[in-house]
Amino acid sequence: MPVFMIERQFAEELEAVDAAGLKEINDEESVQWLYSFLSKDKRKTYCLYEAESADAIRAAAERAGIPADVIVEVTQTIQPDGSFSSLP
């Protein structure tokens, strides 16, 4: 399944999320949240997801009432030695 990086900008500091509610929406949209990075000011996240398409991620975000400012499909990682690795 394709992997996407999502950048989310929040107007206020991010607080605890309703993980069960998000999982239910994501399951219905065939989206799997892998993990996220949270900025120091807690107003921006960079999230890694598996989904069939960017549209599925956008639909899940709209239903959950959270932003999905930038959605980019990613296919490889770059290692510290400069080599590229395909995502599993």
List where the protein language model places each region.
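An amphipathic, aromatic/His-enriched active-site/gating alpha helix that lines ligand/cofactor pockets
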Residues: 28-31, 52-77
